[in-house]
Amino acid sequence: MNHVNQSLVDLLMEEHSGQRSELIAMLAFEKPEVCEELVRLTFSNEEPLSRRAAWPLRKLYDHHPEKMIPYIDYFVLQLQDVKSESVLRTILSILSRCTIPEEYHGMMLEFCESKMLNANTSIASVANCIDIYYAIASGEPDLLRELDLMFEILRPTASAGIKSKMGIIHRKMKKTTSERGY
C-alpha cells in the first residue's frame, strides 16, 4: 500500500462526518492522485471504505464538477458492479447532474430502467435514475413514452418523494412534447 493510499484510508476511517468529507474533497481538488485514489476506493467494494470514499467524491463534484469529468466514463462502466446501495446512490447523484457521453446512453437507459422498476432500489437512487433517464430521453418521443409508462408502473407503490419527482418530470415532458409537436 503506497503512502497516499494509507494516508487517505486513515483519513476516511478515522471520522465519518460532513466536515471530514469536505476536507478530503479539498485534498482531492488540490492533489489529483488523491482524487484518483478516492475513485479507486469508491469502486473497490470494500465496506465501509467504499461508502466513506464516495461521499467526498460527491462533495468534490458539488464544489468543482470539472474535477469529476475525466471519471464519468469510468463511473458509467462500473455501475453494474457496485454492491453498496450507498455508493450507488452517491455515484448516481453525480451522474444525474452531468452530461452522460452519447456512447453510453443505451447502457444508462437500461441500467436506470432496471433500477427504477426494482422495488429494492433506494428512493434516492430511483429519483436520480429518473433524472438521468429523462436527460437522455428528452429529445426522443419514443423514450419519453417509455418513461411515462414506467411512471404508470411505479405510481401505485411509489413514495411521496418519487411521486413528486415523477410529477415534476411529467410536467417537463408535457412541455417538451407540446413545444416540439410530438
Predicted features, each with a name:
Residues 1-182:
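Alpha-helical scaffold domains
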